[in-house]
Regions:
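An acidic/histidine-cluster motif and surrounding catalytic segment
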Residues: 2-121, 130-194
Length: 194
C-alpha cells in the first residue's frame, strides 16, 4: 500500500523499476535521470526492492510530515520504509519504500551552498535511501554520516546532508561558485532545516 502517492494526481514514468514523480519541476532535473540515480544509489547502499521518489513542494512535504510523523513543519526529505511483509511494486518487485523531497528546500539549499539544484535533489534522495536501508543518524553514533560521506564521494556528489548539518559552514569559495550567481546585498537567507 503506497500511501505517499495519494498526493500525486498523475503518475509520470517508471524508470528502472523505480517510480519517480516530479510534481514540482526543477530546472535540469528529468525523471529518467533521477530514476537512474536512484537505482545506482540503491545498489550502492545495498538496499533491495523498488524505491519510489516524489519531488514536490514544501506544503506537500509538510502535510506528509504531519500525517505520518505528527510533525507540523516542513523538512527537506522524508523516508517511508515498507516492511518486508507488506507492499509489492506494480512490477511485482518488493517495495523497499518511498522518499518525498521538498524541491523548495532543495533549491534554497543548493543556492546557499553553491551547487546545482539537481545535485541537491540527488543528495536528498541518497539520504532518504539510507534511511530506507535502516540507517538512523539520530541514534547510530555517526554510522549513517560515514556511510553517506562514502557514498557521496562514490556517486560524485558535493557535501552530504549530515556533513552539512554538523559543520554548518560553507567555504567562501563555494558561496561564490560560478554555478550560482552571488546574492544581492540584503537578500534573505534560506531557513536551515536541521
Amino acid at each position: 500500500m503506497a500511501l505517499l502517492f495519494i498526493l500525486c494526481r498523475i503518475l509520470r514514468e517508471v524508470v528502472e523499476n523505480h517510480l519517480v514523480i516530479l510534481e514540482k519541476k526543477v530546472a535540469g532535473l528529468e525523471e529518467d535521470a533521477l530514476g537512474r540515480f536512484v537505482l545506482r544509489a540503491r545498489k550502492a547502499v545495498g538496499l533491495r526492492g523498488q524505491v519510489n521518489v516524489l519531488v514536490t513542494n514544501s506544503a506537500a512535504v509538510r502535510s506528509l510530515n504531519y500525517r505520518f510523523r505528527d510533525q507540523n513543519k516542513t523538512t527537506d526529505v522524508l523516508s517511508f520504509p515498507v516492511s518486508s511483509s507488506t507492499s509489492q511494486s506494480r512490477k511485482g518487485e518488493k517495495l523497499a519504500g518511498e522518499v518525498a523531497i521538498s524541491a523548495d528546500i532543495a533549491l534554497k539549499n543548493a543556492y546557499r551552498l553553491g551547487h546545482p539544484a539537481v545535485q541537491e535533489i540527488k543528495i536528498l534522495a541518497l539520504h532518504g535511501i539510507l534511511h530506507l536501508a535502516g540507517f538512523d543518524h539520530e541514534r547510530d553514533n555517526g554510522e549513517m554520516a560515514r556511510k553517506e560521506a562514502e557514498l557521496r564521494r562514490a556517486l560524485k556528489l558535493p557535501a552530504a546532508l549530515i556533513e552539512r548539518v554538523t559543520s554548518r559552514r560553507v567555504s567562501p569559495a563555494r558561496r561564490q561558485s560560478p554555478a550560482f550567481p552571488r546574492r544581492k546585498p540584503g537578500a534573505a537567507g534560506a531557513r536551515r532545516m536541521a
